[in-house]
Amino acid sequence: EMGGKNAVIVMADADLDKAAVAIHGGAFGSTGQRCTATSRVIAHPDIKAKLVDRLVAMAEKIKLGSGLDQTSDMGPSVDEKQWSVVMDYIGVGKAEGAKLLTGGTRPDSMKHGFFVQPTIFDGVSPSMRIFKEEIFGPVVSVTTANSLDEALQFANSVEYGLTTSIFTENISSVMKFVDEVETGMVHVNEPTVGGEAQLPFGGTKSTGVGEREMAEEGLNFFTEIKTVFINYSGNAERSMTR
């Protein structure tokens, strides 16, 4: 696995409460420092405003703090270098013309640590860097797509192909999404994060090298097959008749 820019597509018929919970956890869990973290939301215009309102309200309730504090909801970036990367991308988003809805700063009371408030941008176009490049922090970009075809076009437009999710109640939309999305893992009505040890893990395009981790595929990747013939019968002629 070599990077990701994972999207959640939210269609007009989606359960918005479930979608918001999934996006929230996928984006801000582990401070967004997961290869499968949600960093893009591609939403239908009929429901985008309601979805964004939910996401902003949930993000603003997150309590920042030490990972050793059980009352904390989200910890810091892993180190100063990564914190600087995240803050630089927030600056890029502002410069590109995206609308900062919440977050984007380090709280004044937390200058001692590499903390970043949960950050949500709206009005993000597929040409913007914050839409295309991996940030690896608690930053979410929201983009409007008028149809499933357009949503898939936007989702597939980046160089990465790790994981994507869709929220919809339409089975035809689900199957079209599964067939056409260019990622190694797909989710339906659940977060982009998470995996199972018995299932292959990995991506397409610049995300991976073509092989998968875990499951039988992972075993095959990390091992070599050796064919062994042993004649334990004590009969020399038996091996000649094989």
PLM-predicted stretches and their roles:
Residues 1-125, 188, 237-240:
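ALDH superfamily catalytic-core signature
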Residues 9, 63-64, 74, 90, ...:
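Conserved C-terminal structural/oligomerization subdomain of aldehyde/semialdehyde dehydrogenase
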